[in-house]
UniProtKB/Swiss-Prot annotation:
Organism: Bacillus thuringiensis (strain Al Hakam)
Cofactor annotation comment: Binds 2 magnesium ions per monomer.
Protein name (Swiss-Prot/TrEMBL): Anthranilate phosphoribosyltransferase
Gene: trpD
Catalysed reactions listed for this entry: N-(5-phospho-beta-D-ribosyl)anthranilate + diphosphate = 5-phospho-alpha-D-ribose 1-diphosphate + anthranilate
Residues holding Mg(2+) 1: S91, E225
């Protein structure tokens, strides 16, 4: 590890292979916590490259729980977190809208790290059992159309690093790579990131991971979601080509909504917001979810245009299908799925 730390101190980038090997060392129980913390802070100070991100993703996926990966067409819409905006759980709420529109959603997530309520906290409050095994997750994806992958359970080797991340209390490379380490073999992905300068590197990593289509967004105000506040910077991966562009919410009929207007709270407060959106209540929360789910449906290919994606998202909610997916997941995740274990 000393060689890698020395390179980072000197401001040098690591190669993909060096980062892969460093990643395996980070997951080794014999490494000192001080070395892990130093590595994360130095890497953040230098700035992460696509090669470094992909190298670490390789190491983490190698050490993750094994999946059969027989499920075809799965998508994730997990964001990086780390924007400090304290918004409600936009991507988790949107996941049920996607599922209601017919997308298989493998939602990878965690408890709160830099926010009040993480996706796991919200789902637990709603009554979802977040402790599903890989076999159970496969079952849920096939029969319910949505499953939650609790990151610490999927990546047991990360236990010590999670503790150090919490103590550091600043975004690290692990915020960036969270959405990239989903152990399910995804075909498409919608990723919100808090660092605008990482849009292209993250898209390049998604390309290396073999995604058929993907959309990476940095929202107005550096939100790790698409924002109704103003211009959103976007990178689209399609047909193995990467295109950089920007998206204005007004073009799609939305009113401007400041990011402060969609702040969330604790898990109970955020659960109330999510249930309100899925129940069809008109609000700035609903509009934010429609925008994000619409973009995700476009990224998935379920919709040919963003406009069509927003229309499909609205139908998923207003038909009751999105809320039905939540209720199905609550019921199925709490069953004794002995037949699949």
């Amino acid at each position: 590890m000393n060689n890698y730390l020395r390179k980072l101190v000197e401001g040098q980038h690591l190669t993909e292979e060096e980062m892969y090997k460093a990643g395996l060392l980070l997951l080794n129980e014999n490494i000192l916590e001080s070395e892990i913390a130093a590595f994360l802070v130095l890497l953040k100070a230098k700035g992460e490259t696509a090669e470094e991100i992909y190298g670490l993703v390789r190491a983490l996926r190698e050490k993750a729980l094994p999946f059969s990966n027989h499920i075809q067409g799965a998508m994730d819409n997990c964001g990086t977190g780390g924007d400090g905006a304290q918004t409600f759980n936009i991507s988790t709420t949107s996941a049920f809208v996607l599922a209601g529109a017919g997308v298989k959603v493998a939602k990878h997530g965690n408890r709160a790290v830099s926010s009040k309520t993480g996706s796991a906290d919200l789902l637990e409050e709603l009554g979802v059992n977040i402790s599903s095994t890989p076999n159970e997750i496969d079952y849920l994806l096939e029969h319910v159309g949505i499953a939650f992958l609790f990151a610490p359970a999927m990546h047991p080797a990360l236990k010590r690093i999670m503790k150090i991340r919490k103590e550091l209390n600043v975004p690290t490379i692990f915020n960036l790579i969270g959405p990239l380490t989903n152990p399910v073999n995804l075909e498409t992905q919608f990723v919100g990131i808090y660092k605008r300068d990482m849009l292209l590197p993250v898209a390049q990593v998604l390309q290396k991971l073999g995604r058929k289509q993907a959309l990476v967004v940095n929202g107005s105000g550096f939100l790790d979601e698409a924002s109704l506040q103003g211009e959103n910077h976007v990178v689209i991966l399609k047909d193995n080509e990467i295109v950089e562009t920007s998206i204005e919410p007004e073009k799609y009929g939305f009113s401007i909504v400041k990011n402060e207007e969609i702040r969330g709270g604790n898990s109970k407060e955020n659960a109330k917001i999510t249930l309100g959106v899925l129940s069809g209540e008109k609000s700035v929360y609903r509009d934010t979810v429609l925008f994000n789910a619409g973009l995700a449906l476009f990224a998935n290919g379920k919709a040919k245009t963003i406009e069509e994606g927003i229309t499909l998202a609205a139908h998923s909610i207003d038909s009751g299908k999105a809320l039905a997916k939540l209720n199905l997941l609550i019921a199925a995740s709490n069953e004794k799925l002995e037949r699949v274990n």
